[in-house]
Design a protein with these regions (language model features):
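Short active-site neighborhood of thiol/selenol oxidoreductases, capturing the structured segment around
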Residues: 66-89
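Bacterial signal peptide processing site
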Residues: 19-22
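N-terminal "domain-start" segment that seeds a small globular fold
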Residues: 29-68
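Hydrophobic beta-strand anchors of alpha/beta hydrolase catalytic cores
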Residues: 77-78, 107, 154
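Thiol/disulfide oxidoreductase modules built on the thioredoxin-like
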Residues: 122-130, 135-182, 191
């Protein structure tokens, strides 16, 4: 008997709820704001927000300020890497050779990882480079460069400060020199060894 009354009470509440007027249904529907579909063009959406001439202000491991704007007039290679990244370690000698052998090219290495400066110094004793290194946090990367989708990731900056090309994955000195020539920069003269060779 109690079960029957409980069933009647539940059905009665359901009928009453269904009979009430829904004022929200009478109101005109709001038009939702268009939401960009990141799957349609994820790279394009991110690139559109990036400036043509990115700024980069970091402090190197040596404690020196490094500002991309102060390197105008040179081709600058901005290389995101990490100590744990094997392909990053493989390209470091080529980037060092490029920085040493080509007066018109400068390289900055951005260690994109959570690592203490002392630990980075120990790493660089085993894997030395000829260019400055700065540690940047993975939670606060430079705003004018898109967050790397993988490591290593390298940007080639033209002497006027604009971005000539981006490389995802390991890059060889010859690829950078070819990209410089394609962008109107100096070609490697015949008979001169390629940096990193």
């Amino acid at each position: 008997m109690k079960f029957r009354w409980l069933l009647v009470a539940i059905l009665g509440c359901g009928l009453l709820a269904g009979c009430q007027r829904d004022e929200a249904a009478d109101a005109p529907a709001a038009t939702p704001a268009p939401v960009p579909d990141p799957a349609a063009d994820p790279a394009g959406a991110e690139e559109a927000a990036l400036p043509d001439m990115p700024a980069l202000h970091v402090t190197t491991l040596a404690g020196e300020p490094w500002d991309l704007a102060h390197h105008r007039g040179k081709w600058v290679v901005v290389n995101y890497w990490a100590a744990w990244c094997a392909p990053c370690r493989e390209e470091m000698p080529e980037l060092s050779a490029l920085a040493t052998m080509r007066e018109h090219i400068e390289v900055i290495g951005l260690a994109y990882e959570e690592i203490e400066p002392d630990a980075m110094q120990v790493f660089l004793e085993e894997f030395p480079v000829t260019y400055p290194i700065a540690i940047i946090g993975t939670y606060d990367p430079p705003a004018d460069f898109d967050t790397p989708r993988g490591l290593p990731m390298t940007w080639l900056i033209v002497p006027d400060g604009s971005v000539a090309k981006r490389f995802l994955g390991p890059v060889h000195a010859g690829e950078i020199e070819a990209a410089i020539a394609e962008a109107g920069g100096p070609a490697v003269p015949a008979g001169i060894p390629q940096a990193g060779s």
